Amino acid sequence: MLAKLSADSLVKIPRYQALFGKKPLNKKDQEEVSQIISSVDQSFPNRAEGVKFLSERAWEYVSEGKLDTATYRFNLVHALDSTSVEAYWGLGVVAFQRLDFPGAIELLGKGLQINPKLSIMRVDYAIVKLSCYLKNLDCGNLEEVDALLSQALQEDPSNANAWMKKSQVAFLQEKYELAWSYFHECRALDLTQLDLNFSQQLMEKMPDPQGIFK
């Protein structure tokens, strides 16, 4: 789910910061949030259904690049259910897209504490750590990324994106034969997850042992 987008202009406003900036809301914003919560409770048979609805809309805003609105919606999800994995996951993805890697790590980490078996989110967490490494930041290293991806694959061996990222990590570690092995694991599971530009880089270092990519 992770993809880098430009930062929004309203990020300094608390309602558009993750978890409302971790500060008490002003009276106007608090009243608005309370009204929304009341409206959700009246509109759905139970709060879980309301949380599900708001989460789905929030993810739509993420896909449209409307990060301010997505953040506010995920904040509302958290206000409705402080244990919502979707809230932490969504806010973590937004933080990553805003290039706030430490913030993304903190939020995704909290989501994984709530649900440590969520393989897809763990891959997102690993991608943030990998981005730290690629930008020479001290918030991630290849060994850590590889361990996270291995854990994600233990949770779900069919996670094609995890195999693709494992291939990229092996490439960066100059383990090209292993990188090809992981690449083909991804290919066997889901062709849409293959990074064909990466395969060109890999072929420059070592021909495909299976002879499929030339």
Model region roles, listed by residue range:
Residues L2-L5, I13, Q42, A160-K214:
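Terminal, low-structured helical/coil segments at or just beyond the last alpha-helical repeat
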Residues F44-A79:
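Alpha-helical segment of the N-proximal tetratricopeptide repeat
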Residues W59-S63, V85-N161:
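Alpha-helical adaptor scaffolds
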